[in-house]
Regions:
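N-terminal leader/targeting pre-sequences
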Residues: 1-115
Length: 115
């Protein structure tokens, strides 16, 4: 019996044994010093990118004006110094309408500050 190879199986293998093509570190600021994490980007055989994200120290839904869902996107520039005036727009090489920019990623769902 032949076993079909699914994209999920390939993605699992990439995460288990692959080397990221790029890595971005997440770190907090004076207002949110508890934030930290890492985002890893892997090439796939499907002409796309697999994004692995791990974030610690997110405010949970007990924090005023917070929820357990956090938007995630990539900006044109990597300068995240306050007040974020040098980050540029969301990465959008095809000039797509929001929320279909290439840099608009799926939301993170946090559980007790971890996503």
């Amino acid at each position: 019996m032949m076993k079909d190879v699914t994209p999920g199986m390939i993605f699992s293998d990439i995460l288990r044994s692959g080397t990221p093509d790029a890595t971005a570190w997440i770190r907090g600021n004076a207002q949110n010093p508890q934030l930290s994490g890492v985002v890893r980007f892997y090439s796939t055989p499907y002409a796309g990118v697999l994004v692995e994200t791990e974030v610690f120290g997110l405010p949970d839904n007990a924090t005023q004006f917070s929820s357990n869902f956090y938007g995630m996107h990539i900006h044109e520039n990597g300068d995240c110094t306050l007040p974020f005036s040098k980050t540029g727009d969301h990465y959008n090489p095809t000039k797509a309408e929001h929320p279909h920019h290439a840099g608009d990623l799926i939301q993170l769902m946090s559980n007790q500050g971890y996503a």
